[in-house]
Amino acid sequence: MITDFNARGAACLPGHLGIEIVEVEKGRVHARLPVRQQVMAPNGYLHAGSVVTLADTCCGYGCIASLPEGASNFTTVELKSNHLGTARDGVIECTAVAVHMGRTTQVWDATVSHNGKTIALFRCTQMVLYPKA
């Protein structure tokens, strides 16, 4: 599943930024993102959008890995982030955990860290999609 997720995102935004999924299980996903010039803001610090993309990618892949029987996909309907710190080098990591896995919605929390310190908290709600009859 890890290989599939990394291949799935390779030509899209996660791959463009360099996001690597390293662990996937039902209700939990872990990923990392190398901090480099392409993910920085003009002020020299990590761009908030890079952090949000990492967290949203973790939560989204977690949702896909945990879809209820009969569901075909999902769409994000709400997201929120709190940025508590930043990074200028190294690697940032994200762990997303399911808070609610219902038939019509899922809620996921993600924590983004740098060198063991939490730099962002993220929550998103996803609507579970089913094929049209």
What spans do the regions from the language model cover?
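Terminal targeting signals and extreme-terminal segments of soluble enzymes
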Residues: M1-A133
